A protein has these predicted regions:
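N-terminal non-catalytic structural scaffold regions of very large proteins
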Residues: 1-185
Length: 185
């Protein structure tokens, strides 16, 4: 008997969590919480399960060994990864759509996401001062380019990745900014 793959079953579970993020029978604030739970679940899924599958697939490929099939589902690590990725891409597209809809509904309740360009002068001064006094002192951005290797990224930490344009056309570098756990969220 072949069973349902554990990883694919887990993605189905997280799809049900995501569905609560668009369920009109669930209060709006709770919908947003379910979207956050979905994201947190997916982060952990990639750190633990997808990470170990990737290691197994790489090991099997590098040793030119016959790929080991899971005895319950008869799938190799590479086959599991190939099944996970498109399913995850669709779930993430759905999450993005639900999040955009939730932002619209929150705006109807008086909550809105404001771009920096649309702040009042008073708010702009406040946030610039806040950045300079509270955030800037604890930021430690890192550049990744041909002279600077990719840094070690700690597990369960939050990072902001930024593409930096250089003076030369089509030249880009990657900037990585660790978001300190000292920062209030």
């Amino acid at each position: 008997t072949i069973f349902i793959n554990r990883e694919l079953s887990w993605l189905d579970f997280n799809r049900r969590v995501l569905a609560l993020g668009k369920d009109k029978n669930v209060p709006l604030a709770e919908q947003v919480k379910f979207l956050a739970i979905y994201g947190s679940n997916l982060d952990e899924f990639f750190m633990v399960r997808v990470g170990s599958l990737q290691e197994r697939a790489n090991l099997e490929q590098s040793k030119s060994k016959k790929e080991k099939r899971e005895n319950k589902t008869n799938m190799t690590a590479a086959e599991q990864l190939a099944a996970i990725m498109p399913k995850t891409a669709q779930l993430q597209a759905d999450c993005d759509k639900y999040y955009a809809k939730a932002l619209e509904e929150l705006a109807g309740c008086g909550y809105r996401k404001v771009d920096f360009d649309h702040l009042s002068k008073e708010d702009e001064r406040f946030w610039k001062k806040y950045f300079q006094t509270e955030l800037f002192p604890i930021l430690s951005p890192q550049i990744v380019d041909s002279r600077h290797p990719f840094p070690f990224l700690r597990n369960k930490e939050i990072y902001l990745g930024v593409l930096l344009r250089e003076k030369h056309p089509n030249a880009q570098s990657l900037g990585i900014i660790p978001i300190s756990s000292q920062m209030e969220r």
